[in-house]
Amino acid sequence: MSKAIKLPQKLMLLGSGELGKEFVIAAQRLGNYVIAVDRYANAPAMQVSDCCEVISMLSADDLEAVVTKYEPDFIIPEIEAIRTEKLQEFEDRGITVIPTAAATNYTMNRDRIRELAHEELGIRTAKYGYAVTLEELIAVSDNIGFPNVVKPVMSSSGKGQSVVATKEEVEKAWDYAIANSRGDSQKVIVEEFINFEIEITLLTIKQWNAPTIFCSPIGHRQERGDYQESWQPAGISEDKILEAQAIAKTVTDALGGAGIFGVEFFITKDEVIFSELSPRPHDTGMVTLISQNLNEFELHLRAILGLPIPKIEQLGFCASAVILASEKLDAPLFTGVAEALAEPDVDIRLFGKPTAHPYRRMGVALAKAENVETAREKATDAASKIHISSQ
């Protein structure tokens, strides 16, 4: 893309969760036309889009039908479970796939992105191996050593991930990973357990006609492989920030295209270790809804459309904490919102998901304070005040 783009553009979002919802809101503010696609009706992004479609995104025929129907200018994947081979066909026909069809194919699978980073680009990662059967997993785990981390090569929001402390826990980890694998993959990755000081996400914005730029690193904490809270700034040294930026630029340059990438790292006392990469807004980056002048969704949109990003300003010590469901519910109701919002510099986002189940992310609390510790306390306190029920 070398010319100034004309608005509105027609954007097709593949996957319509809470990240997609905030992206659609950003797109609508600049008058764009958005088609939200997902496997179930009334997904969060569908609630704010111009129109929506319910399909299996693993079906090449279903994807062909919706793309033919709407003829979008851009196809923007928001999830992993997509028939990525079809995206290459769309790109060959002149539709812009974000970041590119090839990059999407790489990053939909942990094995491909890990091999790109470690084997092709020579970047330090945790030691790793793969397994497609329980017997292989036992052998690979013995080779990697204990404790280790087992994950599906394709999953959503960290689901299916577990820390395996002993050989006796391997079978349970296998069952959990396969049960939470997305798409048609039955393959798991086993990683060396890194004794890190902090995990960070470096939001990396790759532009069509301007240099790659970065947000301030975001610290985050996970449970069950899924993010629970995040904060910005992360509080790591300038030399480690520069090292993480150099690694992120190397990987995203290899992938190409444009848009925001959530690049995850383990930060140890002495090292910056590449972990994972998502070619889209990152769940931990929801803190930017309160912490930056331009949030990650606005940055993604500007990068996609080739619009300028003159400055990313970090607005102080901020944090986010997830609001999780504890039981299975249809048409969930929320109480405690008024109590949560009574605290200054606190905001709440409820995602509008039509159903709930244990540990499903239903919303997020956002907070700002005079330091990171207080911001984290305010966010988790606000999240704890929100209760989800059927009546």
From Swiss-Prot:
Enzyme's top EC category: ligase
Catalytic activity reported: N(1)-(5-phospho-beta-D-ribosyl)glycinamide + formate + ATP = N(2)-formyl-N(1)-(5-phospho-beta-D-ribosyl)glycinamide + ADP + phosphate + H(+)
EC number annotated for this UniProt entry: 6.3.1.21
InterPro entries for the chain: ATP-grasp, ATP-grasp_carboxylate-amine, ATP_grasp_subdomain_1, PreATP-grasp_dom_sf, PurT, PurT/PurK_preATP-grasp, PurT_C, Rudment_hybrid_motif
Annotated positions binding ATP: R110, K151, S156, S157, G158, K159, G160, Q161, E191, E192, F193, I194, E199
UniProt GO molecular function: ATP binding; magnesium ion binding; phosphoribosylglycinamide formyltransferase 2 activity; phosphoribosylglycinamide formyltransferase activity
Disulfide bonds: none
Keyword Magnesium attached: yes
Domain ATP-grasp: 115-305
Family in the record: Belongs to the PurK/PurT family.
Function: Involved in the de novo purine biosynthesis. Catalyzes the transfer of formate to 5-phospho-ribosyl-glycinamide (GAR), producing 5-phospho-ribosyl-N-formylglycinamide (FGAR). Formate is provided by PurU via hydrolysis of 10-formyl-tetrahydrofolate.
NCBIfam families, per the entry: PRK09288.1 (NF006766), purT (TIGR01142)
Subunit organization: Homodimer.
Protein name listed in UniProt: Formate-dependent phosphoribosylglycinamide formyltransferase
UniProt organism field: Nostoc sp. (strain PCC 7120 / SAG 25.82 / UTEX 2576)
Organism placement in taxonomy: Bacteria, Bacillati, Cyanobacteriota, Cyanophyceae, Nostocales
